[in-house]
Regions:
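Short, Lys/Arg- and Gly-enriched loop/turn segments at beta-strand edges
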Residues: 79-94, 253-266, 427-437
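Juxtamembrane "anchor/assembly" segments of surface/extracellular structural proteins
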Residues: 1-72, 76, 116-122, 130, ...
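Surface-exposed cap/loop segments at beta↔alpha junctions
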Residues: 58-159, 171-172
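Amphipathic, non-transmembrane alpha-helical segments in extracytoplasmic/periplasmic proteins
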Residues: 48-50, 117, 131-156, 175-196, ...
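Structural signature for extended repeat/solenoid scaffolds and their inter-repeat hinge/linker regions
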Residues: 246, 305-563, 567-569
Length: 586
């Protein structure tokens, strides 16, 4: 291996005959074993063992088969290298759960045992759950803390987060995903993997773990490329698990320069050849983007019911609800992950620019709302599946408005606390939008085809700082209302009808103008005319009719009649003139 220089520490190996198997804490006696353990980033570690066991321990296997709970298994080996105290090191190859056991008795009085086991990470991959993490400022550690509460006792934490895993790049919703699927997906947004490591689940690599320097003197070493990434593959007797940091100093075949790089084990396969345990592992460079972003396929096309927390607009200078009450991160062009640009796309862009490239318009002033998904999530799952929305109201979601740009839609916004339908058109939950209101108590009235009305709720003068609950403004030349029978206008306060030019109130039949108090007919600028085609009648049921003016003229072309129990003309006047061609006083 002239191209690889190593610190020449002793070569570590493990004898297959010194492998130890424990099932639920009891050590197993075995012979003639065949062992294979496969692990890789983003997958559970799977082990397959076949050996001959003693019939004296058949009760251990019977108990394991009959047990309803998980059966724990630990597979470990003893190294040839001793520690500072002279004691040989033990290394755990798999700490997990038995998935399947097969027993076969043979004529020699022994048992053939076949066991398939899987890492403890599998317990995260059993129950699909529904959770909202809609706060875009959440960190991976905060999310892991929430999920850890479902597992372990006495505060034990099965999930650990790498030190480079800070804020999740965008808001996320766990929809019909196991915790394993969800963590694997959100870790992919930073290019980092989810890994099963011993009895832990690791979110991203840990750079503060001590790096190992393999001795490759008796190992096969090779280089390969896959999906635009370069890997190194090593096969030898030294065993390294997935996520282990590795240091390698490699000499460039062309320049002869020695360069030391940091790598991670991203695949590992442990197996035995006779009495020798071997390990084939694959190394990826620490600077690589290890995994591509995983879309949320399970939420594509889904609808979650939600409660409106508040209505807003994204232009904070115009909105009564500022951005402090919600985040518009999911509206401003966030991608599904931070994946580097595909080199073929980059090449195409350099060679031929499309003249019709669509302009990417940044969100400016659009109608949005914040939501509480608790009720909808609870409807989707059973106990231990669904969780309340702890981060309600932390993200803006746009909602459908009729003709929103010209603003000609009619009452497009749901009200606070209305149930609405949040729709997810793609595998990116940040692209969700509200398609309308549903399942609100009282909206059954809309099923009546003879009743098409708009009803306001209770007065909001107190809660709404005295502003009108419904403000209707018409900017047009003509506004006409025509119905077949009745138009009824009623107000608990005042009704004002005003026109800058002329106001006509016309009826082809009888028209009544009445009031329980005073009725005033007044013109401040000109005459007030009362005209009837047949008669004009004025009647007061209790007191009198007063006509008060500097001059009063009464003119009749035919006959003028004044009739009463008593008529007084000119009481208190100095002179009373009664004129006519013929005057009769009787």
């Amino acid at each position: 291996m002239n191209s690889i220089l190593q610190n020449q520490k002793p070569v570590e190996f493990f004898s297959a005959e010194r492998i130890k198997i424990e099932i639920d804490g009891q050590q197993i006696l075995w012979r003639d074993m065949t062992l294979k353990i496969d692990s890789r980033i983003g997958e559970h570690t799977v082990g397959k063992i076949k050996y001959i066991a003693s019939l004296q321990q058949i009760n251990i296997y019977d108990a394991a088969i009959d047990k309803d709970e998980d059966i724990k298994i630990i597979i470990s080996g003893r190294s040839n290298i001793s520690n500072e105290n002279g004691t040989s090191n033990d290394k755990i190859f798999l700490n997990g759960i038995i998935d399947d056991i097969k027993l076969s008795e043979i004529k020699t009085g022994s048992l053939v045992v076949e066991i398939t086991c899987i890492s403890k990470s599998i317990i995260l991959d059993r129950i699909p759950r529904y959770r909202s993490f809609q706060d875009p400022s959440l960190t991976y550690s905060a999310i892991a803390e929430e999920i850890n509460k479902n597992y372990g006792a006495n505060g034990e934490k099965i999930i650990s987060v790498g030190e480079d895993m800070k804020e999740v790049p965008r808001m996320t919703i766990q929809y019909n995903e196991t915790d394993w699927e969800y963590l694997k997906r959100i870790a992919s947004y930073t290019g980092q993997p989810l890994m099963a490591s011993s009895n832990k689940v690791l979110v991203g690599f840990f750079k503060n773990m001590p790096a190992q320097t393999p001795n490759l003197a008796y190992s096969y070493f090779g280089k390969e490329t896959e999906a635009e990434r370069t890997y190194y593959r090593v096969e030898g007797t030294e065993v390294y698990s997935v996520s282990t940091p590795i240091k390698l100093k490699i000499r460039n075949r062309v320049s002869g320069e020695e360069v030391e790089n940091d790598y991670y084990v991203i695949e590992s396969r442990i197996y035995n050849e006779g009495n020798t345990l071997k390990c084939e592992y694959k190394l990826g460079k620490q600077t690589d983007y290890f995994v591509d972003p995983i879309p949320h396929e399970k939420i594509r096309g889904a609808v979650i019911e939600a409660r409106t927390v508040h209505i807003a607009r994204t232009d904070e200078s115009k909105s009564e609800h500022g951005r402090a009450e919600g985040s518009s991160d999911n509206l401003e062009g966030r991608t599904i992950g931070a994946k580097p640009l595909n080199k073929y796309i980059e090449k195409f862009k350099n060679e031929s620019q499309n003249e019709n490239v669509k302009e990417k318009v940044k969100t400016k002033d659009i109608a949005v709302m914040t939501l509480d998904l608790t009720e909808g999530l609870m409807d989707l799952g059973e106990n231990e599946q669904s969780f309340e929305d702890k981060y309600a109201g932390k993200s803006y979601f746009p909602y459908i408005t009729p003709y929103s740009q010209s603003n000609t839609g009619f009452t497009p916004a749901p009200e606070v606390n209305d149930r609405v339908a949040l729709y997810f058109p793609s595998g990116n939950e940040t692209k969700a939008f509200v398609i309308g209101a549903l399942n609100n108590d009282g909206n059954g009235r809309f099923t009546n085809p003879d009743k098409r009305n708009f009803t306001l709720g209770n007065s909001q003068s107190g809660a709404n700082a005295g502003k009108p609950m419904y403000d209707f403004t018409l900017n047009s030349e003509v506004f006409s209302i025509s119905v077949g029978s009745i138009i009824d206008m009623s107000s608990g306060g005042s009704v004002n009808i005003s026109g800058t030019s002329k106001v006509n109130i016309d009826s082809s039949g009888t028209m009544d103008i009445s009031g329980t108090s005073t009725v005033n007919l007044k013109s401040s600028g000109a005459d007030t005319n009362i005209e009837g085609n047949s008669e004009v009648n004025m009647k007061v049921s209790s007191s009198k009719i007063s006509i008060d003016s500097s001059s009063i003229g009464i003119n009749a072309s035919d006959e003028f009649t004044a009739d009463a129990d008593g008529i007084t003309i000119g009481a208190g006047a100095s002179t009373v003139d009664i004129k006519g061609g013929e005057v009769k006083i009787k």
